[in-house]
């Protein structure tokens, strides 16, 4: 778990529009909205420096955060970050309230372990991370910080799919409910381009020899 407390101090936002957003940025504030949880949406602002610090943590994007507003605390998850198209700026943050007894749908990062032990890697293959995060559904109390995928047994030309990913108790992958076509690969090992070219060249050579014999 992250050693940094996942907490944001918020203020109610009374002004809207582009001009108001520019004034907020000058005041080191970021516009945001907090919605869900059977309550009305609230337009708020967040402390830019505090937000920047938390955004350095992987857990910020997948874990439950505490928002302090007017002396009250709200539990939320980050649903969207709107970034400036070419400047390193966050222009708006969407936060969804979390209710203890209701499932949340969010994406968590995937941590790949034991890649150097994979037979496919030892055979000269190239590993490809098809998915770096996976959407899950669970109660807030069961929300994992990440999912771990062990690739130590992965062979050349094979893949680990969503259905192969070990899940903590109470966690499910909604994509799998939609059928086998949605059982996407998470990580795979393919032959390198050079190895593939060598194989193709060898195959062509064998075909040429067979033709000469005929």
Swiss-Prot record:
UniProt-recorded name of the protein: Large ribosomal subunit protein bL25
Keywords: Ribonucleoprotein, Ribosomal protein, RNA-binding, rRNA-binding
Biased composition (Acidic residues): 198-214
InterPro entries: Rbsml_bL25/Gln-tRNA_synth_N (IPR020056), Ribosomal_bL25/Gln-tRNA_synth (IPR011035), Ribosomal_bL25_b-dom (IPR020057), Ribosomal_bL25_C (IPR037121), Ribosomal_bL25_long (IPR001021), Ribosomal_bL25_short (IPR020055), Ribosomal_L25_dom (IPR029751), Ribosomal_uL5_bac-type (IPR020930)
Domain of life: Bacteria
Organism of provenance: Alkalilimnicola ehrlichii (strain ATCC BAA-1101 / DSM 17681 / MLHE-1)
Short name of any one Pfam family annotated for the protein: Ribosomal_TL5_C
Lineage: Bacteria, Pseudomonadati, Pseudomonadota, Gammaproteobacteria, Chromatiales
Entry function: This is one of the proteins that binds to the 5S RNA in the ribosome where it forms part of the central protuberance.
